[in-house]
């Protein structure tokens, strides 16, 4: 088994590390952007795949990684961990549908609310104490999910038809243009620094 992750702020990496520490400390974890990651994936049948959700969508780097390596997913068993700031509906389901298209079996899914890095949306702003509570709650969810997985009843957050509808109607359609404006052209306002 191997753990693969993308983590913009460190939240997702933290969650995967906690999950692996409770499930099996011998599992190697590696960021999907590392050069040798896809070769490592090819040598493992079971995968824990973790990423953040942006407005109920996959980060472009995650979608590109899954689609760009479509031939490697056939026959893999994948457990998905999706981190989010508030709500995603089908955060795990977004990648699950891609993985299934490429022949993977989805083992389960786990949604974890974590402190958000988006500072221009009032609903996502939290005090440091609130953020600590969010992390504690996420750790409890991880413990529960690991217990369920070890007992043969994996958590299936975000994988149902109704979760898909909730993600689509609750966020993706409303915020579609938010992520379309993202660019690879970095702009730094030095006067702000």
Which residues fall in each region the model found?
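Cysteine-centered iron-sulfur cluster-binding motifs in ferredoxin-type domains/subunits
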Residues: 186-193
